[in-house]
């Protein structure tokens, strides 16, 4: 059905999550948690142009509100990556995580080895840069599906498989 868009594989994002900061909220029904991060990678899918092979620089934050019923998380993540050719790119994604027992287990630390399935976390990713090679990323639409990965003795990693929305 050519009237519907398709997804072209673009890249894989892996972010190591630091300990959450329970900020709270005096004016909302759902408290704010901030999860900082300073380590992670972007790796392009084969054939995707422009290739975005990069590392997170500085400290980014994922601002998260849980729905009052505890079934979903609302994400608003901000960070900066530096590509292999030294370009800086601001990355923002928003999204929703459906909390099943698998997600709850990893996010609470009850599960120390394992991963959640892809399909309970979806995001919309945008980019901003002053670098000529990557400027067209600002004009494209990207979506991702994610999962959480826990390994004993290591930080929890959130992994996204990201694709560009294209005409079929």
Regions found by a protein language model. Name each.
Residues 1-168:
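Beta-strand-enriched cores of mature, soluble protein domains
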């Amino acid at each position: 059905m050519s009237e519907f868009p398709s997804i072209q594989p673009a890249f894989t994002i892996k972010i190591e999550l630091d300990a959450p900061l329970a900020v709270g909220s005096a004016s909302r029904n759902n408290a704010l948690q901030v999860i900082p991060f300073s380590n992670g990678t972007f790796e392009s899918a084969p054939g995707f142009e422009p290739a975005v092979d990069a590392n997170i620089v500085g400290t980014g934050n994922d601002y998260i509100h849980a729905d009052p019923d505890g079934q979903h998380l609302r994400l608003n993540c901000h960070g900066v990556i530096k590509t292999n050719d030294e370009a800086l790119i601001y990355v923002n994604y928003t999204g929703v995580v459906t909390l099943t027992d698998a997600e709850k287990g990893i996010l609470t630390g009850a599960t120390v080895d394992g991963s959640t399935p892809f399909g309970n976390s979806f995001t919309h990713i945008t980019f901003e840069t002053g670098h000529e090679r990557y400027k067209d990323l600002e004009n494209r639409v990207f979506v991702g599906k994610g999962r959480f990965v826990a390994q004993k003795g290591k930080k929890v990693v959130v992994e996204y498989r990201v694709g560009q929305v294209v005409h079929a």
